């Protein structure tokens, strides 16, 4: 619900994908643009191993909350570039249903040693739909 509310309020508009790790994931949603920012609050993890998304795991196209440890979710999220085994510590809340080619293109952008893209990758719009 947090992501949906922020998206509907336009929170993500003009933010960047500040972290790109080839063949792993892209991360965005930080208003400071460096991985330290958020909406001004945090919320608890919503981890439910019984759900289908957790049974499938962190597969290509999955969208999950980025965090700095348990119960530190805010506005930052990541999108998986390929199927990857991760501990179930990140709240999965969606999957890319359109535009995975754009995600893949971002995943191949040149980055510096800190995984920051050499050129800004700006989020123009976030659209949430239910399937």
Role assignments for model-derived ranges:
Residues 1-131:
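Cyclophilin-like peptidyl-prolyl cis-trans isomerases
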